[in-house]
Structure formats: structure tokens, C-alpha cells
Amino acid sequence: MFSDIPNNRILRWDDCSGALSVFREPSHNANGHTRDRDGRLVSCEHLTRRITRTEYDGRITVLADRFDGKRLNSPNDIVCAQDGAIWFTDPSFGINGHWEGEPAAQELPHAVY
């Protein structure tokens, strides 16, 4: 899996067949991805300023979109630990223009959660 951020999609590469396909479109300008301990895709979405998980049936579950009542900036890189904890970076560059999201006010400092 990898992101095509400006084209608002997540692509899937099949190493066996060499086929490239669209996994999710729109992706809400998703950037960083990882797998949780159950193999589900967890993504950082710049446009919606949230962390989501793609369920086995394709449904999207929002895991986080706020901290202390304030909207996240533009979650970027992410990792899931063996114990189920999720760590991610939250810089502001996805809300600074239209290239990777939409312009918006920053509510939180740049941080790692």
C-alpha cells in the first residue's frame, strides 16, 4: 500500500503479479499507513485530520480526530506497537494549502501522540 496524496487515493501493488490497483478512492489525502496487530490498514488522513482503520469489510472506522477537544493538524506518519498502541506524528503541513489537504487553522502544536 502507498499513497498518491495529491490524487486523493491509496494504491496497492501486488508483488506476485506486478499489478497496480486502487485500494481506496477518495482517501482523504491519506499519507502514512501501517497495519495493526490484526492486519487491518491504519491510515493518517490529511484532509479530514484524523486517524482511520479500514475494516476487513471495507468500512472505515475513525480512531482519532481530536486531542484535548481540539482537531488534529494533519496526521502524517504512523506505527502500531505489538501491544496495540498507536503512535503518530501530527505536523501542520497538510492544512497549509491545497496540495495535501485544505487550508485550515492549526489548533494544536506539532506533536507525536
Outline where the language-model segments fall:
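Sequence-structural signature of mature extracellular/luminal beta-sheet repeat domains
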Residues: M1-Y113
